[in-house]
Amino acid sequence: MKATALLIAVFILFSVFGDMGYCEFCDTPHCTRVCYDHCVRLNKHYKTCCMTNINDRIRMECLCEDKTGIKPYYPNNI
């Protein structure tokens, strides 16, 4: 019963907010350079870069890795 309620809640959340936070892979030299520099500045290893469209605003998301795992970081100087 609880599992069914949880699945329904997750489905509703993805239905309403599904397009928010979708990150499209970006492998252009600009994306790579900005994210690589951003990860190095944070003392982390660069993994990849993607672009997120939230409410018609494009935002770059850098995926950096350290010993705790891979996490997203958002550079301000795009």
UniProtKB/Swiss-Prot annotation:
Signal sequence bounds: 1-23
Entry's Gene Ontology cellular component terms: extracellular region
Tissues where this protein is expressed: Expressed by the venom gland.
Location of this chain's protein in the cell: Secreted
Keyword hit for Coiled coil: no
Source species, domain of life: Eukaryota
Chief localisation class: secreted
Keyword check for Disulfide bond: yes
Keywords from the UniProt entry: Disulfide bond, Secreted, Signal
Modification after translation: Contains 4 disulfide bonds.
Name of protein: Toxin-like protein 10
Species for this entry: Urodacus yaschenkoi (Inland robust scorpion)
Lineage: Eukaryota, Metazoa, Ecdysozoa, Arthropoda, Chelicerata
